[in-house]
């Protein structure tokens, strides 16, 4: 049974305002979603926080999120807290997210980690459409469970898909399936004793592979690597035994990117 009477929806559309900074052009949301007004931590980079006024996702919860980042906008989107997926019993919780990043626009999508509780089943599907001049940082951090309770890999199933298109041509696809019933997630080809996993994609970002590699090597408690995709963009995969090392690594990379992206002419 869905916690809410209908599918939870969030719509956000941005544009460049009179002062030359990214502002909200239009928005709409249903419970539990809310949006904070944008603030500007640096130059013309806007930051908007997505809020979910709920204890987490339950069985039957379905979220439909659509984000349209207007041309020339520079925006960072964050979440309010760690996302919890509760025991979904014999069902599942799901999220479909569609993101459009306009010409010469920059989006840094940086949510907090996702924590699947015991017997949680979650399905996530994200599609991102870019123009050739769009810039993107997109990440997800997945936790093995409630680590402090030693509840590791007790969830039912977690399946997330990320599809990125540039001028309608596919340039990146990630299909993550974590199923403790069929796979030993602690084996050396999976988590290998770690409990937190970062997946970060960088498209058209002003940072070299060597710079990202240096960030990883300097990050204490992180085991990770960066690779170049066939379309010459970057993908980072990293493991750690806590959220903080991965959040710090992600922030370090994002800071290097935005130092260039937000420079005013």
From Swiss-Prot:
Phenotype of the disrupted gene, per the record: Cells do not express urease.
Its biological purpose: Required for maturation of urease via the functional incorporation of the urease nickel metallocenter.
The name this protein goes by in its record: Urease accessory protein UreH
Binding partners and assembly: UreH, UreF and UreG form a complex that acts as a GTP-hydrolysis-dependent molecular chaperone, activating the urease apoprotein by helping to assemble the nickel containing metallocenter of UreC. The UreE protein probably delivers the nickel.
A Gene Ontology molecular function term of the record: nickel cation binding
Species name: Helicobacter pylori (strain ATCC 700392 / 26695) (Campylobacter pylori)
Keyword hit for Chaperone: yes
A GO CC term attached to the entry: cytoplasm
Key words of the record: Chaperone, Cytoplasm, Nickel insertion, Virulence
Localization: Cytoplasm
Protein family according to the UniProt entry: Belongs to the UreD family.
């Amino acid at each position: 049974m869905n916690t809410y009477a209908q599918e939870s929806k969030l719509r956000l559309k941005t544009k460049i305002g009179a002062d030359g900074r990214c502002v909200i052009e239009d928005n709409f949301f249903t419970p539990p979603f809310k949006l904070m007004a944008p603030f500007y931590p640096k130059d013309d980079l806007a930051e908007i926080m997505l809020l979910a006024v709920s204890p987490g996702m339950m069985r039957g919860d379905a979220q439909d999120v659509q984000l349209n980042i207007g041309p020339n906008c520079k925006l960072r989107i964050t979440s309010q807290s760690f996302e919890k997926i509760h025991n979904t019993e014999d069902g599942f919780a799901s999220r479909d997210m569609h993101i459009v990043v306009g010409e010469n626009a920059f989006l840094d999508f940086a949510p907090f980690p996702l924590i699947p509780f015991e017997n949680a089943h979650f399905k996530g599907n994200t599609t991102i459409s870019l123009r050739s001049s769009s810039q993107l940082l997109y990440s997800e951090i997945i936790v093995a469970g409630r680590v402090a309770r030693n509840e590791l890999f007790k969830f039912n199933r977690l399946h997330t898909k990320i599809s990125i298109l540039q001028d309608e041509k596919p340039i990146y696809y990630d299909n993550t399936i974590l199923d403790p019933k069929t796979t030993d997630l602690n084996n050396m080809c999976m988590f290998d004793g770690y409990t937190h996993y970062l997946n970060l994609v960088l498209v058209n970002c002003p940072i070299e592979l060597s710079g990202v590699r240096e960030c990883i090597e300097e990050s204490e408690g992180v085991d990770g690597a960066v690779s170049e995709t066939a379309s010459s963009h970057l993908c980072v995969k990293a493991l750690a035994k806590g959220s903080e090392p991965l959040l710090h690594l992600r922030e370090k990379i994002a800071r290097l990117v935005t130092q260039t992206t937000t420079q005013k002419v």
